[in-house]
C-alpha cells in the first residue's frame, strides 16, 4: 500500500453524523490500551494521526479518517476502546449501542481489525466483539500487538492459547509490533483482501 495522504474526517456518535458512504471502510476495535492508536499510526505512517492516551477509555466517539493511496483509497474508523473499569457507567452504557449501530448498519464497512495484546488471553469483552462481528457477517481481522514484548517461545505459546480461545486457526492471527513495525505489510494485505473481496 502506497499512501499519498491521510486526513481526519470527523467524529460521530449517531449514524446521521457519519460521513457519506463514498469509500470502503475498515474499522479498528479493541480493549483500552491494547495499542490500537499505535497500530493505526504505524500503518498510515503518521506519528500522531491518532492520539495515544495515558488514560484508558478516553476515546468515546467513532473517529473517521480518509486514506488516499494506491492501489485503493478507504476510510479507517477508530472505534472506542472498551473494557476499562474506571470509565463511568453511563459512558459504558453508551458505547455498546453506539458500536452495535455502526457494526450492524454501516453499508460501507468491509471488515473490522480486532486488536488483542499478545500477552493477554482474550477477555469476555473481546469475545463479545468477535461474536458481534460474526453475527453481523463482518470480516474479522485479528491482530496481536506488542509482539516485541514477548520471547519467541512466549509468542508461540500465547498465539496458540489465543487462537483456541477465539476458536480460530493460528494462521488467521497477524503478529504486529509498533516498535519494529513488523506486521505492517501483513495488516495492509488483510485490509486489501477485505476491501476487494467484500466489495459490492
From Swiss-Prot:
UniProt GO BP: division septum assembly
Residue positions binding GTP: 30-37, 57-61, 78-81, 145-148, 176-178
GO molecular function: GTP binding; metal ion binding
Annotated ranges, domain EngB-type G: 22-197
Transferase is among the record's keywords: no
Binding site for Mg(2+): 37, 59
Co-factor requirement: Mg(2+)
Gene Ontology CC: one annotated term: cytosol
Protein family membership: Belongs to the TRAFAC class TrmE-Era-EngA-EngB-Septin-like GTPase superfamily. EngB GTPase family.
Record NCBIfam families: GTPase_YsxC, small_GTP
Task performed by this protein: Necessary for normal cell division and for the maintenance of normal septation.
Name of the protein in its database record: Probable GTP-binding protein EngB
Organism: Trichlorobacter lovleyi (strain ATCC BAA-1151 / DSM 17278 / SZ)
Amino acid at each position: 500500500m502506497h499512501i499519498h495522504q491521510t486526513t481526519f474526517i470527523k467524529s460521530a456518535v449517531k449514524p446521521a453524523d457519519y460521513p457519506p458512504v463514498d469509500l470502503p471502510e475498515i474499522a479498528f476495535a479493541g480493549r483500552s490500551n491494547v495499542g490500537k492508536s499505535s497500530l493505526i499510526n504505524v500503518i498510515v505512517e503518521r506519528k500522531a494521526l491518532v492520539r495515544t492516551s495515558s488514560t484508558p477509555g478516553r476515546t468515546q466517539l467513532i473517529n473517521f479518517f480518509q486514506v488516499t493511496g494506491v492501489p485503493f483509497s478507504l476510510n479507517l474508523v477508530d472505534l472506542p476502546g472498551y473494557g476499562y473499569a474506571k470509565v463511568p457507567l453511563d459512558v459504558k452504557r453508551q458505547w455498546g449501542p453506539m458500536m452495535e449501530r455502526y457494526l450492524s448498519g454501516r453499508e460501507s464497512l468491509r471488515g473490522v481489525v480486532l486488536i488483542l495484546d499478545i500477552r493477554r488471553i482474550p477477555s469476555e469483552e473481546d469475545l463479545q466483539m468477535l461474536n458481534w462481528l460474526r453475527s453481523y457477517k463482518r470480516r474479522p481481522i485479528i491482530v496481536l500487538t506488542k509482539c516485541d514484548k514477548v520471547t519467541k517461545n512466549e509468542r508461540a505459546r500465547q498465539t496458540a492459547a489465543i487462537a483456541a480461545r477465539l476458536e480460530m486457526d493460528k494462521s488467521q492471527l497477524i503478529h504486529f509490533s509498533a516498535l519494529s513495525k513488523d506486521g505492517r505489510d501483513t495488516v495492509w494485505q488483510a485490509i486489501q483482501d477485505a476491501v476487494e473481496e467484500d466489495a459490492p
